[in-house]
Amino acid sequence: MEVALTRIAEVRMGYSFRSRLEADAQGDVAVIQMKDIDDANLLHPEGLARIQMSELKDHHLLREGDLLFRSRGITNSAALVGKGIGRAILTAPMLLIRPNTEIITPAYLQWFINHPATQAMLAGQAAGTAVKMIGKGTLNQLKITLPPLETQRLIVKTARLASSELALLEKLQARRKALLERILLQTAQNARRHQAGKDVGLGAQATEPAKRSTQRLSKQL
């Protein structure tokens, strides 16, 4: 089943400040800006600017499970608010998505919005030339594929496992490359010593390190 986002979540604009933010380390409210979300769509609350907002109404505050949508930029992806966010607000031009958790899980909605197919669809609907923008109205009408909650959770779990596997493979590949580079360098150095040995008449004794390096390289590959 496909439904418009507006039927399963509330979409609202981030908080608009009338003047430049004045950070206060002792402030009672954390402010989330676009720069606080990295390329992997992860929010880093430890580095948030803080301000004093004594008259802030509670409905502006973020909750666990809210999605923070990048309405402008190269990608129009979403980050998920986790536990322990405390008193925090989202600034404009970002959009806040608050899912109806009786219908859709926040993690599934984030996965769906960030999926390459959805991102391609949003890119086609973005307005502007130099800076692309997705408006609240466009986002509200985004069609969301809505499987049962149990299936949503399974999809998220599988996607996370796949991401973890990919990260592990990339780490192993990087280590293998580093090992190969060390072996190649050692082979080159041993070959140089072998040549120097030949020059002074050491002959076969100097060839052994180079041979061992070459054999070790063959086994590694």
Placement of each model-derived feature along the sequence:
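A short beta-sheet element
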Residues: 71-112
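Short, surface-exposed loop/turn microsegments at beta-strand edges and helix-strand junctions
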Residues: 22-29, 48-49, 60-62, 80-92
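A short glycine-rich beta-alpha junction/loop motif
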Residues: 88-93, 128-153
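Short hydrophobic-aromatic micro-motifs
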Residues: 30-33, 62, 67-70
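A structural connector/turn signal
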Residues: 56-57, 84, 129
